[in-house]
Amino acid sequence: QDAPTGDAAAGAKVFNKCQTCHMVVAPDGTVLAGKAGKTGNPLYGLDGRAPASYPDFAYGDGIKELGAAGEVWNEADFLQYVADPTKFLKTKTGDTKAKGKMTFKLPNEKEAHDVWAFLNSLAPAPAAAEAAPAADAAAPAAADAAAPAEPAAEGAAT
């Protein structure tokens, strides 16, 4: 997955519009963002995740179809979805009757980029999450590093 292009701090402010319906809750149950919004699906770990894949959430048919087809969330699709959920679903599924359950729209592209960056700042990237067990073994070395991201950045350049 590519690094988000938005401003996470600005996205935190824009997320105030989203928290009426959505929350970001870590796997351990810690609420990272949002209040009591349960109308919309949880948004933790969205990058690289299949649409409609959070358990115990009543998704619409169109978004479930995308998840079943093997699609995964990325920044470009997120931007299109939040700009117009129904249009996105019709385009992606090819079903002219597809309808998004999310009625709110965020057509401002900069704000959408910022929200994506904010959501990504709250959850590990898919590659980082998969590498977590190996990272535990290297914990003593990581403790000596100036910044946790430096080893990954150096490794990515090779």
UniProtKB/Swiss-Prot annotation:
Span list, region Disordered: 129-158
Keywords, comma-separated and alphabetical: Electron transport, Heme, Iron, Metal-binding, Periplasm, Photosynthesis, Pyrrolidone carboxylic acid, Transport
Primary localization class, coarse: periplasm
This protein's name: Cytochrome c2
Family: Belongs to the cytochrome c family.
MF terms in GO: electron transfer activity; heme binding; metal ion binding
Modified residues (Pyrrolidone carboxylic acid): 1
Functional summary from the UniProt entry: Cytochrome c2 is found mainly in purple, non-sulfur, photosynthetic bacteria where it functions as the electron donor to the oxidized bacteriochlorophyll in the photophosphorylation pathway. However, it may also have a role in the respiratory chain and is found in some non-photosynthetic bacteria.
GO CC list: periplasmic space
Subcellular location field: Periplasm
Binding positions (heme c): 18, 21-22, 102
InterPro entries according to UniProt: Cyt_c-like_dom (IPR009056), Cyt_c-like_dom_sf (IPR036909)
Domain of life assignment: Bacteria
UniProt PTM: Binds 1 heme c group covalently per subunit.
Alphabetical GO biological process terms: photosynthesis
Species the sequence originates in: Fuscovulum blasticum
